[in-house]
Amino acid sequence: MLSPLKELLFPIHCFGCRAVGIEICSKCRKFWNPHFYLQSIEGLTVYSAIKYSPVARSILLGAKESSFKIADELIVEALVNCLKRLPTPIIRNAVLFPIPGSRGAIRKRGRDFIFEITQEVSMRCGVPIVSGMIIERSLLDQSGLSAVDRKRNINGAFKYRGEFIN
């Protein structure tokens, strides 16, 4: 009974095109379709669940800046899907390593978005979380930066103060 009233007062909009009725419409779903992507970046093997796109950006910002639980769930589902596809020798030794947000950003948002998502993914997959990463220096707001500027912005910004796993 309350659900139809809630939908009338607070309609769901597609994160991609803003169409009313569903969090991600079939047209925009092709830009948010969890897969298992594997690439090498500067000698580091990177596994990812989603290719970056305007739809992905909207979902990430919806979770990060607006605390939309629907966006959180889309991100968690994509990450869980990717982790479950990892080869057994890799997933057996995998850990989740959340990148910390600044105290100011966490205070402004009212939550530590990355840590909350990491906890949920850990719970669903049984992959442990390793903490100990700290912010060493202040960072610029990443939202308006290019890929090159983002890389420059985070270079040397984090430090690990935990035990290393062999």
Feature map (PLM): residue ranges:
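Glycine-rich phosphate/pyrophosphate-handling loop used in enzymes and phosphotransfer proteins
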Residues: M1-N166
